[in-house]
Amino acid sequence: MKQNRKNLPIILASSSPARIELLNRIKIIPSQIIPADIDETPNLRELPAPLAIRLAYEKAIKIASQIEASAIIIAADTVAAVGRRILPKATTYEEVKNCIKMLSGRRHRVYTGLCIIKKENDQLTVRQKIVQTIVKFKKLSDEEINFYCSLDEGIDKAGGCKISGYAEAFISFISGSYSNVMGLPLFETVNALTSLGFRCSSIMPAKMNYCHSAT
């Protein structure tokens, strides 16, 4: 009788709590969390979608080059944009406020670049996907903008807002994957894992081990 092949361990190339939570929703607990420290500065005239997929690939390939054992590396990068204008991952109150003002009353697009690399016997197999979601915020009052900024939940978030937090109350329209806006499109993630031989229906939880990239 043919034995079922054991799944390779999963490495998540991100310390994002949202991405960890999303993987947990589909019963995947990474064996390791290894944040990939890369330069995320957009290239000159780089558009949002190419930026997201490039950064996801760079994260995944960096971790693949650092590990010796066989594993599957999941990396993602999320970019919010109004038209061709890439919004920053806000780091200050003022950046959050500027982003929310720009999003108020209009549609924006959220792109997540997904890159999954299977490393086995020093051979790399790569799966890449760019996923787009359209989101529209209602017209926000100054009071709503100031209140949201006071929550600090938009700090370090693409476009200055946490879609699974209070900002969800601002959404009047959404088209596409909700998990994509949170940072990891689950439908595409499962499809990519399955294509690499990972059996998502027979996942054995593993103890989570937090690691950091070598500096």
Curated annotation (Swiss-Prot):
One of its GO terms (cellular component) is cytoplasm. It catalyses: a ribonucleoside 5'-triphosphate + H2O = a ribonucleoside 5'-phosphate + diphosphate + H(+); a 2'-deoxyribonucleoside 5'-triphosphate + H2O = a 2'-deoxyribonucleoside 5'-phosphate + diphosphate + H(+). The active site is at 77 (proton acceptor). InterPro entries: ITPase-like_fam, Maf-like. It is an enzyme of class 3 (hydrolase). It comes from the Bacteria. Disulfide bonds: none annotated. Its EC number is 3.6.1.9. GO terms for biological process: nucleotide metabolic process. GO terms for molecular function: nucleoside triphosphate diphosphatase activity. Keywords: Cytoplasm, Hydrolase, Nucleotide metabolism. It is found in: Cytoplasm. Its cofactor is a divalent metal cation. Coiled coil: none annotated. Its main location: cytoplasm. Belongs to the Maf family. Nucleoside triphosphate pyrophosphatase. May have a dual role in cell division arrest and in preventing the incorporation of modified nucleotides into cellular nucleic acids. This is Nucleoside triphosphate pyrophosphatase. It comes from Rickettsia africae (strain ESF-5). The lineage of its organism: Bacteria, Pseudomonadati, Pseudomonadota, Alphaproteobacteria, Rickettsiales.
